Curated annotation (Swiss-Prot):
This is Isoaspartyl peptidase/L-asparaginase. GO terms for molecular function: beta-aspartyl-peptidase activity; hydrolase activity, acting on carbon-nitrogen (but not peptide) bonds, in linear amides. It comes from Lupinus arboreus. The active site is at residue 174. The keyword Protease applies. The lineage of its organism: Eukaryota, Viridiplantae, Streptophyta, Embryophyta, Tracheophyta. Cleaved into an alpha and beta chain by autocatalysis; this activates the enzyme. The N-terminal residue of the beta subunit is responsible for the nucleophile hydrolase activity. Degrades proteins damaged by L-isoaspartyl residue formation (also known as beta-Asp residues). Also has L-asparaginase activity, which is used to liberate stored nitrogen during seed development.
């Protein structure tokens, strides 16, 4: 519906603008993807940060990951309930620890050590997400099973991932951003609140390097959709592997992974190559996505290309 679609489109337009401006100002792709995903985490219309959906206990457990293509350094976090911007904590894990992944209490303790901004967990609980949880509990479903009850198919987002929601609200998903600069340096970042009515402690594809997020010297990928399907197919890494080992173009690799390797209605992704090729395939009804190129061309869309 327009009242749900418009704020998301406006959010994508804003994020596209700040991302392009940052690249023009010679910010690194790593800086750019963190900046854009932070903006999405701060927008209650997306399922990350302030807009995160709720677990079956009515709590928030956020997760995120970030990866630099050239160095292949990466950082990931999950089980966060008080960190304002999970993507920035993921970057700190990458840059300030010998590890790649911190979760739950250990991640929140690390956030305090680093002086990361935290808030009371109630900050993340919105009326809209309380209602979503109520509907999911009444239907006795984790919000991923759209085979019954009035669930629409998942929609995904270039600046966000999408999962099904009751009453035609198909705008719950992960947010993600990929970027490449004029030197071909690449980066990817992904963040989410997960699934409506998920079990406490459930971890999806978003913080898993190679599943929801991946970047190397060939491409950067951020995936969205049903986390379990993305994990099983190692979606983000498979796109890069097909380019590396089979010599496929980015579009060929991304299309193959989405349309041949994953069940229909479960996956979408955004990807960019070192040469600046863009791919945004999805096998869901739609996917919120946006992209911009250095020549000034840009696109914001939901539905499949005509």
């Amino acid at each position: 519906p327009p009242e749900r679609r418009k704020p998301r489109e406006e959010g994508l337009r804003h994020c596209l603008q700040i991302g392009v401006e940052a690249l023009k100002a010679r910010k690194s792709p790593l800086d750019v993807v963190e900046l854009v995903v932070r903006e999405l985490e701060n927008n209650e219309h997306f399922n990350a940060g302030i807009g995160s959906v709720l677990t079956n206990s009515g709590t928030v457990e956020m997760e995120a990951s970030i990866m630099d293509g050239k160095s292949m350094k990466c950082g990931a976090v999950s089980g966060l309930s008080t960190v304002l911007n999970p993507i920035s904590l993921a970057r700190l894990v990458m840059e300030k620890t010998p590890h790649m992944y911190l979760a739950f209490q250990g991640a929140q303790d690390f956030a305090k050590q680093q002086g990361v901004e935290t808030v009371d967990s109630s900050h993340f609980i919105t009326a809209e997400n309380v209602e979503r949880l109520k509907l999911a509990i009444e239907a006795n479903r984790v919000q991923i099973d759209y085979s019954q009850y009035n669930y629409t198919q998942p929609v995904q987002d270039d600046a966000e991932k999408e999962l099904p929601v009751a009453n035609g609200d198909s705008q719950i998903g992960t947010v993600g951003c990929v970027a490449v600069d004029s030197q071909g340096n690449l980066a990817s970042a992904t963040s989410t609140g997960g699934l409506v009515n998920k079990m406490v402690g459930r971890i999806g594809d978003t913080p898993l390097i190679g599943a929801g997020t991946y970047a190397n010297e060939l491409c950067a990928v951020s995936a969205t959709g049903k986390g379990e399907a993305i994990i099983q197919a190692t979606v983000a890494r498979d796109v890069a592997a097909l380019m590396e080992f089979k010599g496929l173009s980015l579009k060929e690799a991304a299309d193959y992974v989405v349309h041949e390797r994953t069940p229909k209605g479960t996956v979408g992704l955004i990807a960019v190559s070192a040469a600046g090729e863009i791919a945004m395939p999805f096998n869901t009804t739609g996917m919120f996505r946006a992209c911009a190129t250095e020549d000034g061309n840009s696109e914001i869309a939901i539905w499949p290309p005509a």
